[in-house]
Protein backbone atom coordinates (compact mmCIF):
# COMPACT_ATOMS: atom_id res chain seq x y z
CA UNK A 1 0.00 0.00 0.00
CA UNK A 2 1.11 3.64 -0.35
CA UNK A 3 1.31 3.94 3.44
CA UNK A 4 3.56 0.89 3.73
CA UNK A 5 5.78 2.17 0.94
CA UNK A 6 6.09 5.55 2.65
CA UNK A 7 7.00 3.89 5.95
CA UNK A 8 9.59 1.74 4.16
CA UNK A 9 11.34 4.70 2.56
CA UNK A 10 11.26 6.73 5.74
CA UNK A 11 13.15 3.93 7.45
CA UNK A 12 15.61 3.74 4.57
CA UNK A 13 16.19 7.48 4.73
CA UNK A 14 16.79 7.27 8.46
CA UNK A 15 19.48 4.65 7.83
CA UNK A 16 21.12 6.73 5.11
CA UNK A 17 21.14 9.81 7.34
CA UNK A 18 22.94 7.84 10.02
CA UNK A 19 25.87 7.44 7.63
CA UNK A 20 25.61 10.84 5.95
CA UNK A 21 25.53 12.72 9.25
CA UNK A 22 28.00 10.47 11.03
CA UNK A 23 31.64 11.24 11.85
CA UNK A 24 34.36 11.00 9.23
CA UNK A 25 37.85 9.64 9.75
CA UNK A 26 39.17 13.17 10.28
CA UNK A 27 36.78 13.62 13.20
CA UNK A 28 38.45 10.71 15.01
CA UNK A 29 42.09 11.44 14.24
CA UNK A 30 44.37 13.75 16.20
CA UNK A 31 48.16 13.90 16.39
CA UNK A 32 49.94 13.67 19.76
CA UNK A 33 51.17 17.25 19.57
CA UNK A 34 47.63 18.67 19.74
CA UNK A 35 47.05 20.21 23.20
CA UNK A 36 44.48 18.39 25.33
CA UNK A 37 42.90 19.09 28.70
CA UNK A 38 44.33 17.17 31.70
CA UNK A 39 41.11 15.30 32.39
CA UNK A 40 39.78 11.74 32.27
CA UNK A 41 36.90 10.87 29.95
CA UNK A 42 34.72 7.79 30.29
CA UNK A 43 31.32 7.76 28.64
CA UNK A 44 29.58 4.54 27.72
CA UNK A 45 26.29 2.64 27.77
CA UNK A 46 24.66 0.08 30.01
CA UNK A 47 22.50 -2.72 28.71
CA UNK A 48 19.40 -4.64 29.67
CA UNK A 49 19.45 -8.43 29.77
CA UNK A 50 17.68 -8.80 26.42
CA UNK A 51 20.22 -6.54 24.67
CA UNK A 52 23.42 -8.44 25.46
CA UNK A 53 22.76 -11.88 23.99
CA UNK A 54 24.79 -14.56 25.78
CA UNK A 55 26.77 -12.01 27.81
CA UNK A 56 25.99 -11.14 31.45
CA UNK A 57 24.47 -7.67 31.54
CA UNK A 58 25.03 -7.31 35.29
CA UNK A 59 28.75 -8.00 34.95
CA UNK A 60 29.05 -5.60 32.02
CA UNK A 61 27.11 -2.82 33.71
CA UNK A 62 28.49 -3.10 37.23
CA UNK A 63 32.12 -2.57 36.22
CA UNK A 64 31.26 0.50 34.15
CA UNK A 65 29.08 2.06 36.82
CA UNK A 66 31.42 1.41 39.76
CA UNK A 67 34.38 2.83 37.84
CA UNK A 68 32.39 5.97 37.01
CA UNK A 69 31.26 6.45 40.59
CA UNK A 70 34.79 6.15 41.89
CA UNK A 71 36.24 8.47 39.25
CA UNK A 72 33.62 11.13 39.97
CA UNK A 73 34.22 10.89 43.69
CA UNK A 74 38.02 10.98 43.52
CA UNK A 75 38.76 13.21 40.53
CA UNK A 76 35.95 15.74 40.74
CA UNK A 77 36.15 18.22 37.86
CA UNK A 78 39.01 16.25 36.31
CA UNK A 79 36.53 13.55 35.31
CA UNK A 80 34.06 14.04 32.46
CA UNK A 81 31.45 11.68 31.10
CA UNK A 82 29.04 9.16 32.56
CA UNK A 83 26.34 6.91 31.19
CA UNK A 84 24.53 7.72 27.98
CA UNK A 85 21.05 8.56 29.35
CA UNK A 86 19.03 5.75 27.80
CA UNK A 87 15.73 4.77 29.39
CA UNK A 88 17.43 1.78 31.05
CA UNK A 89 20.24 3.94 32.46
CA UNK A 90 17.80 6.55 33.78
CA UNK A 91 15.81 3.86 35.56
CA UNK A 92 18.69 1.89 37.10
CA UNK A 93 21.66 4.27 37.43
CA UNK A 94 20.36 7.86 37.67
CA UNK A 95 23.36 9.02 39.72
CA UNK A 96 25.92 8.57 36.93
CA UNK A 97 24.12 9.92 33.86
CA UNK A 98 26.12 12.06 31.46
CA UNK A 99 25.10 15.48 30.20
CA UNK A 100 27.81 15.44 27.52
CA UNK A 101 27.08 14.96 23.80
CA UNK A 102 25.87 11.49 22.86
CA UNK A 103 25.36 11.81 19.09
CA UNK A 104 28.35 10.24 17.38
CA UNK A 105 29.92 13.18 15.58
CA UNK A 106 29.54 15.63 18.45
CA UNK A 107 30.69 13.01 20.95
CA UNK A 108 33.86 12.20 19.02
CA UNK A 109 34.83 15.85 18.67
CA UNK A 110 34.11 16.44 22.35
CA UNK A 111 35.79 13.37 23.83
CA UNK A 112 39.15 13.72 22.08
CA UNK A 113 39.78 17.01 23.89
CA UNK A 114 40.86 15.12 27.02
CA UNK A 115 44.16 13.49 27.93
CA UNK A 116 43.05 10.13 29.35
CA UNK A 117 40.39 7.72 28.15
CA UNK A 118 39.12 4.81 30.26
CA UNK A 119 38.47 1.60 28.36
CA UNK A 120 36.54 -1.53 29.34
CA UNK A 121 35.58 -4.56 27.29
CA UNK A 122 32.80 -4.58 24.74
CA UNK A 123 29.93 -7.04 24.77
CA UNK A 124 30.96 -10.70 24.68
CA UNK A 125 34.58 -9.66 25.36
CA UNK A 126 34.90 -7.92 22.02
CA UNK A 127 37.26 -5.02 21.44
CA UNK A 128 35.14 -1.98 22.21
CA UNK A 129 35.04 0.81 19.62
CA UNK A 130 36.23 3.18 22.31
CA UNK A 131 39.75 1.77 22.34
CA UNK A 132 40.25 2.50 18.65
CA UNK A 133 38.79 5.97 19.17
CA UNK A 134 41.31 6.71 21.93
CA UNK A 135 44.16 5.50 19.73
CA UNK A 136 43.02 7.60 16.77
CA UNK A 137 42.92 10.67 19.02
CA UNK A 138 46.40 10.00 20.45
CA UNK A 139 44.98 9.76 23.95
CA UNK A 140 46.41 7.94 26.93
CA UNK A 141 44.45 4.85 27.92
CA UNK A 142 43.69 3.26 31.28
CA UNK A 143 42.18 -0.13 30.54
CA UNK A 144 40.62 -3.17 32.18
CA UNK A 145 42.46 -6.31 30.98
CA UNK A 146 39.24 -8.05 29.95
CA UNK A 147 39.17 -5.59 27.06
CA UNK A 148 42.14 -7.46 25.54
CA UNK A 149 40.95 -11.02 26.15
CA UNK A 150 40.75 -11.67 22.40
CA UNK A 151 44.25 -11.20 20.95
CA UNK A 152 44.89 -8.70 18.18
CA UNK A 153 47.39 -9.45 15.38
CA UNK A 154 49.77 -7.04 17.13
CA UNK A 155 48.74 -6.90 20.76
CA UNK A 156 48.75 -3.52 22.56
CA UNK A 157 51.47 -3.51 25.21
CA UNK A 158 50.79 -2.91 28.87
CA UNK A 159 52.76 0.07 30.11
CA UNK A 160 53.28 1.37 26.58
CA UNK A 161 49.84 1.73 25.02
CA UNK A 162 47.80 1.54 28.23
CA UNK A 163 47.97 1.24 31.99
CA UNK A 164 45.92 -1.64 33.42
CA UNK A 165 43.45 -1.67 36.29
CA UNK A 166 41.59 -4.50 38.01
CA UNK A 167 39.37 -2.50 40.38
CA UNK A 168 37.71 0.94 40.36
CA UNK A 169 40.22 2.10 42.98
CA UNK A 170 43.12 1.02 40.80
CA UNK A 171 41.56 2.80 37.84
CA UNK A 172 41.63 6.06 39.79
CA UNK A 173 45.24 5.44 40.80
CA UNK A 174 46.35 4.82 37.22
CA UNK A 175 44.47 7.85 35.92
CA UNK A 176 46.14 10.05 38.52
CA UNK A 177 49.49 8.59 37.55
CA UNK A 178 49.05 9.73 33.96
CA UNK A 179 47.65 13.13 34.93
CA UNK A 180 50.63 13.76 37.23
CA UNK A 181 53.39 12.54 34.89
CA UNK A 182 53.69 14.64 31.75
CA UNK A 183 56.57 12.56 30.36
CA UNK A 184 54.61 9.32 30.73
CA UNK A 185 51.55 10.94 29.17
CA UNK A 186 53.42 12.24 26.15
CA UNK A 187 55.22 8.94 25.60
CA UNK A 188 51.92 7.07 25.65
CA UNK A 189 50.28 9.58 23.31
CA UNK A 190 53.15 9.10 20.86
CA UNK A 191 53.01 5.30 21.14
CA UNK A 192 49.26 5.18 20.63
CA UNK A 193 49.42 7.44 17.60
CA UNK A 194 52.07 5.17 16.09
CA UNK A 195 50.07 2.02 16.91
CA UNK A 196 46.97 3.54 15.33
CA UNK A 197 48.84 4.52 12.16
CA UNK A 198 50.44 1.08 11.80
CA UNK A 199 47.65 -1.26 12.97
CA UNK A 200 44.24 0.40 13.28
CA UNK A 201 43.85 3.11 10.62
CA UNK A 202 41.63 1.70 7.83
CA UNK A 203 44.28 1.73 5.11
CA UNK A 204 46.89 0.16 7.39
CA UNK A 205 44.45 -2.46 8.67
CA UNK A 206 43.45 -3.46 5.13
CA UNK A 207 47.08 -3.65 4.03
CA UNK A 208 47.98 -5.84 7.01
CA UNK A 209 45.08 -8.18 6.23
CA UNK A 210 46.21 -8.51 2.61
CA UNK A 211 49.80 -9.16 3.69
CA UNK A 212 48.75 -11.88 6.12
CA UNK A 213 46.62 -13.45 3.42
CA UNK A 214 49.53 -13.37 0.99
CA UNK A 215 51.86 -14.93 3.57
CA UNK A 216 49.32 -17.65 4.33
CA UNK A 217 48.81 -18.68 0.70
CA UNK A 218 52.55 -18.51 0.05
CA UNK A 219 53.07 -21.05 2.83
CA UNK A 220 50.68 -23.62 1.33
Kindly give the residue locations of the regions a language model identified.
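Nucleotide-sugar donor-binding catalytic core of glycosyltransferases
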Residues: 1-128, 142-154, 158
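Catalytic binding pocket for nucleotide-activated donors in carbohydrate/polymer assembly enzymes
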Residues: 93-98, 107-220
Amino acid sequence: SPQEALTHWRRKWGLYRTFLDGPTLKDFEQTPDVPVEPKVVFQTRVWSEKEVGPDNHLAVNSLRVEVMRRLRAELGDQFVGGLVPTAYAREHYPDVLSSAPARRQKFIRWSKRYLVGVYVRGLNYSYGFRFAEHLAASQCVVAHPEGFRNPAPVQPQEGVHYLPFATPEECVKQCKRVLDDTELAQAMRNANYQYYQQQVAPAAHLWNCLERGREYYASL
